[in-house]
């Protein structure tokens, strides 16, 4: 299933302290040809491409070409993706097939929350940028990536896992709702000069 999330406007986010994370959980799905584990810096280029291609396919029609180009250059350049991967507050996960090819990605982000998310902000973590290569849709990869992030967040003691999803992406929102997430509010999402609305969803872990 094609799913995508986008980061919320940083001006709305609540910054909370980041604590050191325990050893990463690795997820191998029994009976599946997909393995989910933390991404390698050597995979930054393919992760940047999957992110840019999926974002363009999902959201590109809704903004001008200039705004899209600006956003992609700021967010999905290989340099910026690599910087994210080296940020101790961010853990990037990759889904790989048996050949080792990266087919999807997702991020666990520590130290940010939204005011509408219930509970203590210091116990919140964010699920960010769930993207699956278009040729790999329909294989349950999105759900497997979400499950891996949820498992890691629980292992680190987080109590709420929140995310944002574009208001005009009902397919992605249905997936999250089916997996137990609930809508708690809305935030602005800025692409270049275009301001759009994302729904804030969260799940108790």
Task: Locate predicted features.
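Conserved catalytic-core motifs of GNAT/GCN5-like acyltransferases
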Residues: 113, 162-165, 177, 182-199
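Acetyl-CoA-dependent GNAT
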Residues: 3-9, 13-23, 29, 38-44, ...
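Short amphipathic helical patch at the helix-1/turn junction of helix-turn-helix
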Residues: 132, 166-167
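Helix-turn-helix
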Residues: 172
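Glycine-rich ATP-binding loop(s) of histidine-kinase-like ATPases
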Residues: 137-141
């Amino acid at each position: 299933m094609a799913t995508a999330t986008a980061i919320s406007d940083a001006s709305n986010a609540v910054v909370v302290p980041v604590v050191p994370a325990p050893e990463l959980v690795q997820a191998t799905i029994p009976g599946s040809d997909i393995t989910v584990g933390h991404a390698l810096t050597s995979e930054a280029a393919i992760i940047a491409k999957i992110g840019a291609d999926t974002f363009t396919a999902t959201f590109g029609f809704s903004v001008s070409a200039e705004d899209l180009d600006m956003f992609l250059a700021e967010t999905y350049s290989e340099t910026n993706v690599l910087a994210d991967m080296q940020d101790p507050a961010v853990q990037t996960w990759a889904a790989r097939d048996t050949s080792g090819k990266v087919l999807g990605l997702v991020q666990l982000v520590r130290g940010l929350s939204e005011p509408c998310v219930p509970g203590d902000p210091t116990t919140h973590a964010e699920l960010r940028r769930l993207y699956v290569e278009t040729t790999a849709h329909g294989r349950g990869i999105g759900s497997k990536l979400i499950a891996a992030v949820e498992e890691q967040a629980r292992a680190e003691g987080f109590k709420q896992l929140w995310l944002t999803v574009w208001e005009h992406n009902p397919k992605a929102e249905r997936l999250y709702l089916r997996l137990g997430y609930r809508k708690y509010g809305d935030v602005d999402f800025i692409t270049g000069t275009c301001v759009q609305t994302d729904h804030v969803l969260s799940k108790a872990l």
